[in-house]
Structure formats: C-alpha cells, structure tokens
Amino acid sequence: MHRYRSHHCAALRKCDVGIKARLSGWVHRVRDHGGILFVDLRDHFGITQIVADPASPAFKIIEKVRSEWVIRVDGEVRARSDEVINTSLPTGEIEIFAKEVEILSKSDELPLPVFGEPDYPEDIRLKYRFLDLRRETMHRNIMRRTEIIAAIRRSMQENGFTEFTTPLLTASSPEGARDFLVPSRIHQGKFYALPQAPQQYKQLLMMSGFDRYFQIAPCFRDEDPRADRLPGEFYQLDVEMSFVEQEDVLVTMEPIMRSLFEEFADGKPVTQSFPRLSYEEAMRKYGSDKPDLRNPIIMEDVSQHFYDSGFKVFAQILANDENARVWAIPAKTGGSRAFCDRMNGWAQSEGQPGLGYIFWREEQGKFEGAGPIAKNIGEQRTEALRMQLGLENGDACFFVAGDPKKFLPFAGAARTRVGEELDLVDRDCFSLAWIVDFPFFEWNEEEKKLDFAHNPFSMPQGGKDALECQDPLTLKAFQYDLVCNGYEIASGGIRNHSPEMMLKVFNLAGLSKEVVEDRFGGLYRAFHYGAPPHGGMAAGVDRIIMLLQGVKNLREVALFPMNQQALDLLMSAPSDVSPVQLRDLGIRIAPAAKND
C-alpha cells in the first residue's frame, strides 16, 4: 500500500464497504458523540468521515488531534446507517473505522478558522492565505479559475490561435498607468519596466508573419487598487489577428466569449447575440461606457418640456447654456414620496444639490403628477412627460440638468442606484454588449491639449483623410469594448499600421517624431518593413472569473493577492533590501521629506 494513501478523501463509496483503505489529509473538525470520536478528514478532493470508539487501537491518538493537524488513517470502510447518511457529501454513505492513525504534522492555534467560513478581517486572511485557501469557498474559486483558464486556452486553440509568450522585462512607456520599474545592474542608471500589457509585442508578432496570437498574459500597473482591480498584477487574455477589420475581430471573439460564459454560468442565461452600442448611445442612454444592461432603465432627453417652463431652475439652466439639457431617469414602481426623498438625500450625499422628481398617482381614472417639479411645470407638461417616458400609476421619474459632459457620471450613478433600490436589476443572467465608435481624442482642460481617449495605437475611422481634414475632437476610432453586467471585461481595436499616420496621431497629442522613435522605436521601425493590417483585443481574466463566480472582489478569485494598500502581507512585500544590493545597482535611497 502507498505510504500515505490508497484513496483520496472523496473517492470511497458504498460499493467499497469492507475494503481496507488508507487516507491522509487535514483534520477538518472533531466531534465526540457519547465517547465515540468522529473526525472529518479533508484533502484537495473532499471529505471522509473517520470513526473511532474506545475499543479502536487508534482511539488514544485520535483523542489528541486538533483542527488542521495532518494525519494518516488506516481503517475499514463501513456503511453508515440510513439515519446518519450525509447526502451533501459524495462519501456520505460510508465512513472509515480507524485502526491505525499516524500524526504527520501538527498545527499551532489557528489565527482564522477553516471550518465554517465565518467572515474574517481581510488582512488576516491575506497574511495567512495558505489557511484561507483551505476554506471550501476559496478552494472552489481557485479551482474554477484554473478550469476557466484551461477552457480559454482550449477555445482559442480550436479557433486557430497560437499561444506565444512575450518578454516580462521591457522598456518603460509613460502612457497609461505608472510602470513598475526594474533597475539594471549592468547598465546602471537605466531601468527596465514590467509590461502594462504586451501591446507592442503582440503587434510585432503580426509584423513577424504570425497570423493569430493569444496569451494568458501577466500585466503590471502601479495604480491605486479597487474592488474590481488588483493592485500590482493581473492577467488578461491577449489577442491579435492579421489581415482583419473590426467586424472580423468581433465576429471571431463573440462566440468564444459567449461559449466561455455559457460553460461556467451554472445555468444562468447568457446574451446570445451581443448588441452593439456606440459610445455616444451608451453614454446618452445609460450614462456609462460600461452599462449594466440588466438594469432596464433608459435615460431620455426631456429638455423640450422645460424650456420657458414654470420650473425656473431648469428653465434658466437651458436658457443660459446652449449645451445644457435635462435628462430623465424613469423609475418604474418608484412612485412614493419616501423613496423619492431618499434618492434626493442620496444625491446630496454625493455632493449634488439634490435630485428633482415627479411621481404619478391615478385618481378617478386620471394620472396626477406629484412633487415640486410637477406643481411648477403644470398639468399639461407633466402629462406629456409621463407619455414620453411610458410611465404609469405608482411610477416616478428623476431629473438631472446642465451640460451632459459634466453631469454624465452622476446621472449614470443615479440610474444604477434607482435600479438597485427598486430591485429592477436581473441578478440571474449575464448581459453582454459591444461598445464601439469611441472618440479618438479628448480635451485635457488642465493642460490645454489633446489626450488619447482610449488606445493611441488604434486606427482612426476615415484613415489619413480624416486625420488631415476633421476636427480631432470629432474623430472616431476603430476601438471597441466588451461589457458585462456593468463591467468592462475586454477592450481592443484595429491598429494603425502606417508609420506616417502613427506620427500624425502622436503629433496631434503633442508628441514629436523624436519622442515617438524613442518610446516606440521597435514598433515604429517595424511599420517601415511591410506591416499587415491587424487588430485584436484583451480580456480581463480575473474580472471574468469574478463575474462567473458571483463575487464582488477580485481578491476572492486570486491566489496570493496584495491588500488594498498594495502590500503582500504573506511575503512581506515590498520589503527593504540590503545596502549591498542597492550599491550593486547604483541606487541610493533619498530620505523621505518631513512634513512640517
């Protein structure tokens, strides 16, 4: 018999009754029922119940064991009586009568429990992640992560993509987030950077004659953490294709993403044909470029009802600014003063002056609007609003006014809040959509210059003619995002493969030819030697797994993540290094400035 086990802890069944078995694992819990000891023995695969009575030669040893000790058990497989069968366990019809027990390893007092999975402070969980990962939910999340990544690889290979591994030490690129810098010992004073994404390398692969590339790529960005973004590093499904237009990429990747969600959705419906929304449409209807389409609320422009109206606040806003609009956020079933006042209070807590509203009641077969706005604009305008928005008895509507460019973030947040408060959001589905036609540039008011709105390497719609003839702020890019349930899960574009257009694009953003050659020299040179039209995308693996597992925090689906302060509490990183190491690198740490 094997030194440690003949079976794992989820293997034995009723058909194995009578055989001798050897199991090894962790003591999940110990119970004493009238002098008979029961041990739930756990390993990677599952749990088996071990039994020892005072007549068992193993009894005295089992009396000593505690939670999370590692033991080996030899014994006989016995059937449980009908009244004690545990239908929640695959091994619930049997138990092992222990005849010999060996203690392989003891455990100190646990800083957090493994059995029962109560809520525990996250920093404790991360410091003792090896214990946290023993818990059933975390173990299941990590195993599901592995299964999802394996399914991605299988699907990509079935669709003709080849996996390539790109370098992890590369040049710093100041665009986007901050780089993690790695000092060079050999070339002192110079630095490598960990890649924020394999963007240039995957394009260079297309220049090198390869056709369809993918990689489960580690990416590194020195940015502030949040629940849907891991500090430090994350993984993305990186994709690039040669000789393609935007339609080719979308048509290729949509069934791959749909089948991935269907495989791991646990029966929840998945969008079969992903709708396509322009960036402008998404912002106008939902106040977000990553709308949650499970929320049925669609915002509408209702400005015409407020021009020269009795509600002077909105009327004056419209009269004083030609860009001003009034948008409505319909709230089905939200027609109570208590709810409307609660939303108004929430808006004030968000730094807004308030959130105007109307709610409707049916009196003697006639709809009447209630609230200050209805009172001021009058019955006719109130009824016209209701008809435009398709609202009925017991419904409400909230309003935001001003320049949409300024109020959009709040309007989108208000739409989300209303949908959640009124339980309008369908939690049991995955709603996916493409967002297309992103603006190429945006205006940086602080620095009085153009910034790239999305990806600087994308192709402008209209090509060279558009670059030369159009107002840069009206340019659209061949860029697209894939969104799901309010999260951006993928982003991509058709690349600019012309060196002349590349220089023109960067010049509009204030970067000279010399700067482009310095920062993107490898890619720029490659464009001069026969660059194929190409495009691709990158999907956030961690975020997709988070959605499929139904958790709100990426750290619940990552093995050894940092905490919110970008600290690895398990490995004590970042850490001090020795003076010798610094000297070898030619680095001196400047003392931190004191705050007077």
From Swiss-Prot:
The UniProt record lists the keyword Ribonucleoprotein: no
Binding site for ATP: 221-223, 488, 540-543
Pfam family, one: tRNA_anti-codon
A single GO BP: aspartyl-tRNA aminoacylation
Keyword Nucleotide-binding: yes
Enzyme class, spelled out: ligase
GO cellular component, one term: cytoplasm
Keywords: Aminoacyl-tRNA synthetase, ATP-binding, Cytoplasm, Ligase, Nucleotide-binding, Protein biosynthesis
Reactions that this protein is recorded to catalyse: tRNA(Asx) + L-aspartate + ATP = L-aspartyl-tRNA(Asx) + AMP + diphosphate
Residues of the site described as Important for tRNA non-discrimination: 33
Enzyme Commission identifier(s): 6.1.1.23
InterPro entries referenced in this protein's UniProt entry, alphabetically: Aa-tRNA-synt_II, aa-tRNA-synth_II, aa-tRNA-synth_II/BPL/LPL, Asp-tRNA-ligase_1, Asp-tRNA-ligase_1_N, Asp/Asn-tRNA-synth_IIb, AspRS_core, GAD-like_sf
Region (Aspartate): 199-202
Subcellular location: Cytoplasm
GO molecular function: aspartate-tRNA ligase activity; aspartate-tRNA(Asn) ligase activity; ATP binding; nucleic acid binding
Domain of life: Bacteria
UniProt-listed CDD domains: AspRS_core, EcAspRS_like_N
Binding positions (L-aspartate): 175, 221, 454, 495
Subunit annotation: Homodimer.
Biological role stated in the UniProt entry: Aspartyl-tRNA synthetase with relaxed tRNA specificity since it is able to aspartylate not only its cognate tRNA(Asp) but also tRNA(Asn). Reaction proceeds in two steps: L-aspartate is first activated by ATP to form Asp-AMP and then transferred to the acceptor end of tRNA(Asp/Asn).
Protein family membership: Belongs to the class-II aminoacyl-tRNA synthetase family. Type 1 subfamily.
Protein name listed in UniProt: Aspartate--tRNA(Asp/Asn) ligase
Lineage: Bacteria, Pseudomonadati, Pseudomonadota, Alphaproteobacteria, Hyphomicrobiales
Gene transcribed to yield this protein: aspS
